[in-house]
């Protein structure tokens, strides 16, 4: 399946492709 962008931001970055930091969690671009 596709990434869900649910990880926590680390130093303002997200490691899932197509995701951006919406502190404290990553959201879809």
From Swiss-Prot:
Record location of the Cyclopeptide (Gly-Asp) cross-link: 1-29
GO biological process, one term: killing of cells of another organism
InterPro entries linked: Cyclotide, Cyclotide_sf
Keywords: Cytolysis, Disulfide bond, Knottin, Plant defense
Modification after translation (UniProt): This is a cyclic peptide. Contains 3 disulfide bonds.
S-S bridge residues: 5-19, 9-21, 14-26
Keyword Transport attributed: no
Family matches, as SUPFAM superfamilies: Cyclotides
Record's comment describing the protein's domains: The presence of a 'disulfide through disulfide knot' structurally defines this protein as a knottin.
UniProt record similarity statement: Belongs to the cyclotide family. Moebuis subfamily.
Function: Probably participates in a plant defense mechanism (Potential). Binds to and induces leakage in phospholipd membranes, particularly ones containing 1-palmitoyl-2-oleophosphatidylethanolamine (POPE). In vitro, displays cytotoxicity against cultured cells but no hemolytic activity towards fresh erythrocytes. Not active against Gram-negative bacterium E.coli ATCC 25922 or Gram-positive bacterium S.aureus ATCC 25923 up to a concentration of 64 uM.
Entry protein name: Cyclotide mela-2
């Amino acid at each position: 399946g596709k990434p869900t962008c649910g990880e926590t931001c680390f130093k303002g970055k997200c490691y899932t492709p197509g995701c951006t930091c919406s502190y404290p969690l990553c959201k879809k671009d």
